[in-house]
Amino acid sequence: MIHPLSDIQSTNIGVNTRIWQFCVVLAGAKIGAECNINAHCFIENDVIVGDRVTVKSGVYLWDGTRLEDDVFIGPNVTFANDKYPRSKQYPGQFHGSIVKKGASIGAGAVILPGVVIGENAMIGAGAVVTKDVEATTVVAGVPARLINSK
């Protein structure tokens, strides 16, 4: 189901994926099967979203971002992909983040460029993630720090 009030330019949308109102998905984006992309999301060209991924409202996925299968992205999570942003000056390469299988990111977290979030990791709401997060760990705070690991 693609809501009629969304602008979906990509033809690479998996079966049973739902994209709600006021979303923009650019032509080069790839979204897997059984995903749920909530209202007011923006997905750039060089973005890959796996299967069974939930992206809550207000999330922008910039070039270079990779979300593996079974990932949860809470509302208003911010991904950055440019380490030194300047108006009308673009890097030779964007540094998107990778969110590994089964990881969850809480509401309002900020993920800085190039960060890798490990499998089944949990990012607390409002955290600012400045470096890679190991698999099966919980991080929270500003900057994000280890809270728990299995």
What are these regions (language model features)?
Residues 1-4, 12-13, 19-116, 142-143, ...:
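Flexible, glycine/small-residue-enriched loop-and-beta-strand segment within the central core
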Residues 77, 135-137, 145:
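Glycine-centered loop/turn positions within well-structured domains
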Residues 108, 125-126:
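Low-complexity, intrinsically disordered short peptide segments enriched in small/polar/basic residues
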Residues 119-122, 128-130, 135:
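Internal alpha/beta core interface subdomains
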Residues 123, 141:
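Conserved G/P- and acidic residue-centered "switch" motifs that form tight phosphate/ATP-binding loops
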Residues 128, 143-146:
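Conserved switch/coupling elements of ABC/ABC-like ATPase nucleotide-binding domains
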